[in-house]
Every structure is written in C-alpha cells, then in structure tokens.
Amino acid sequence: VEKKDKYNKHHLTPFQALMISTASRFGIGNIAGISAAIVAGGPGALFWMCLMAFLGSASAFIESTLAQIYKTKDVFGFKGGPAYYIKNGLGIKWLGSLFAIILIITYAYGFNGLQSYTMTSAFEIYYDKAGSNITFAQSGLPIGIGLILTAFTAVMFFSKSHIIGKVSSYIVPFMALTYILLAIIAIVLNFKEIPAVIKMIIESAFDFKAIFGGFAGSVIVIGIKRGLFSNEAGMGSAPNAAAAAHTSHPVKQGLVQAMAVFIDMTICVASGMIVLFSQAYLTKQTGV
C-alpha cells in the first residue's frame, strides 16, 4: 500500500509521467526524422532504428529507475533526473550541475529550434504552392508561428508539473492513437505492398555497400542516430519526468518508461511504412 502524504496533490501518477516523456518522444523525430533517415540511409535504416529501440529500452529503464531512487521532495512534489543522481549517487556535484546546464541549453536552442524550423518549413511549402506575390518571410507567418509556439511553451514552462501531467494525459493518447489509426488505414489500403516493403527493408538493412560504404554515413549509423534522436533513450530528458512520478517502487517507473520507447518505435514504424508505400523517399526530399 502506498503511503499517502500531504504532497500527493502535486505528484504525477506513473501514467502522467509516461505521457510527458512520450510527448517529448513523439514529434519530428517520428515523422520528419524517419523521412530523413530513409532518404539518407535507405529503407534499411528503419530496421536499425527498431533494433535500437530494444537497446534503448534498457537505457530508459536504468535512467528512469535511478531518477526514482535519487529523487528529492519539496512542497511542489518530487524532483530528480540525471543531474540529481550524478550529484547524489556519484557524489560529483559539479558534473551534475554541468549536465543540467548543457541539457537546458540543448533543449532551449537545439530541440525547440528544430521543432519550430520543421513546422515553419511545412507551412512554407504550402504557402509557396498558393502562388502569393508576397514571399513567405515577408508574410509575417514565420514570426507568427514563433510567437504561438513561444506562448504555448511559456504556459507549460510556468505551470506546475501535475498540471502539465494532466494536460499531457489527455492530449498525448489522442495524438498518438490518431496518428497510428491513420497509419493503419494507409497500411490497409496498401496491403498488397507489405511483403515487398518488408523485403526491401531487410535487403537494404544488410546490403554490404549500404553498411560499409562510408561508414559514418552508413545505413546502420544513420538508423542508430535517428533512433536515438526519436526515442531519446539515454539522453537524460525523460528521467526528469520519471522522477516526478509517485510510485510504490522505482523499478515500476523504469518499466513504464521502457515501454515508452516501444510506443515511440510503433509510431516510427508507422511513419516509415507510409514513406515507403508512397515512394516519396525516391525524390530525396527529407521533409526537414
């Protein structure tokens, strides 16, 4: 039986922590990232991305379990993550602080910038097709998109973790299930192509030239890089959400977060099948 305390109203449930971490995993890495991986490495990159998910789930389990073990508690709930277990577990305070600073900079200027760039690029494609005399940059749409994203980010940033958890627990399942449903429809409509697509993935994954031809750009390396970018296993972001969950045993949250990697893999496979059915990768357009 879990011990109840006065801070429970600020705690995340294991499901809410799962949805927060899934929200960070479900994004451009699952859609544009898949397209870029297939264009750069061929259909076989999808195979290595899936294989990386099995290895990544172990990383997700370990980092989330450690986040639960070394978390701390205050009046706003639980706090933890890699910075905390580096400091409290390894006893290296400066390294934990450095990790926290690098993670903040990476997400503020790297991941968020890539998300907004991809969204803006998608709008630009359709804007150019409309044939307007005003360029996309002059239209003010890029600034408008940036302001909208900034507003949503600010709301989440200044909200308490349990509020973010509640919002994510409603939005993320709907978002993920809707996308998977659309992918299933696409697969059903192209049912006859499934054997050929699977054969193409396997042959490309183990093609000698694709594996060893310029190893830094080989199908294996591309698949692994895109897989890690998509599922975020071992990157140190998901454990921050995992630490905020109120659970009876650290391992339970570790298992929940490991499952999130397989949810991400399912969405990646769905995106990959859509790209391969359409043969859009042959145009060398990455969608980024």
Q: Where are the model-predicted features located?
A:
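Select transmembrane alpha-helical segments in multipass membrane proteins
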Residues: 10-21, 92-107, 145-148, 210-230, ...
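Membrane-interface alpha-helices at helix entry/exit sites of multi-pass transporters
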Residues: 7-12, 42-51, 84-88, 92-100, ...
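Membrane-interface loop-to-helix entry segments
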Residues: 1, 118-123, 140-189, 194-202
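Extracellular/periplasmic helix-exit of transmembrane alpha-helices
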Residues: 62-70, 75, 182-200, 208, ...
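Flexible loop linkers connecting adjacent transmembrane helices
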Residues: 1-12, 36-46, 58-90, 281-288
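Helix-loop junctions at the membrane interface of multi-pass solute transporters
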Residues: 25, 34-41, 67-73, 104, ...
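Helix-loop-helix module between adjacent transmembrane segments
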Residues: 52-76, 82-83, 87-117, 121-156
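Membrane-interface "cap" regions at the ends of multi-pass membrane proteins
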Residues: 1-31, 75, 246-248, 252
